[in-house]
């Protein structure tokens, strides 16, 4: 089973480098192509990622490949991810944020789970803060008020609504 993943970067070389390194370090069970797409970062993130690739900072392991693409204009997060779609020959593709930090072979685990559940077309892992607390995401009904309330821990009455997202 072949995997691919894409991280879109805008002015975030250090963060994207760490994310890419954890993806490469932990994704070992299945072949992986990791795409890093720079969205025309004025800080030179794209060129820095290319240099990291050539210097070995983004060292691909056995069965892994790293591809850096630099866009000439910032078309946004979706456009950056869509850029790689024509190149894909993977069985499963992952859209990753540049702040992701893997601590296990999560991509292989998700792909294996998807393989065992062919009726499912999309999945995501549980997201946690560095201290292990779950991150609340507005995945069911995205509205401004709940998004604001989730940021205010003093509003304990809102906890029931937050629990619906776990």
PLM region spans:
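A conserved acidic beta->alpha catalytic loop
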Residues: 22, 38-49
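Short, flexible, basic/aromatic active-site loop/helix in glycosyltransferases
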Residues: 142-166
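Short aromatic/hydrophobic "clamp" motif used to bind/position activated sugar donors
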Residues: 93
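Cell-envelope/extracellular polymer assembly enzymes that use nucleotide-activated donors
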Residues: 2-4, 33
């Amino acid at each position: 089973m072949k995997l691919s993943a894409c991280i879109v970067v805008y002015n975030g070389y250090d963060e994207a480098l760490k994310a890419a390194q954890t993806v490469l370090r932990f994704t070992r069970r299945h072949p992986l192509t990791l795409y890093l797409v720079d969205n025309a970062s004025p800080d030179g993130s794209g060129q820095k990622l290319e240099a990291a690739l050539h210097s070995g900072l983004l060292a691909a392991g056995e069965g892994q490949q790293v591809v850096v693409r630099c866009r000439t204009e910032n078309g946004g997060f979706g456009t950056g991810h869509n850029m790689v779609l024509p190149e894909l020959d993977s069985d499963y593709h992952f859209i990753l944020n540049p702040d992701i930090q893997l601590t296990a072979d999560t991509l292989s685990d998700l792909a294996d789970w998807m393989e065992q559940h062919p009726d499912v077309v999309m999945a995501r892992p549980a997201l946690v803060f560095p201290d292990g607390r779950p991150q609340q995401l507005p995945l069911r009904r995205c509205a401004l008020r709940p998004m604001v309330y989730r940021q205010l821990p003093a509003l304990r009455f809102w906890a029931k609504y937050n629990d619906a997202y776990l």
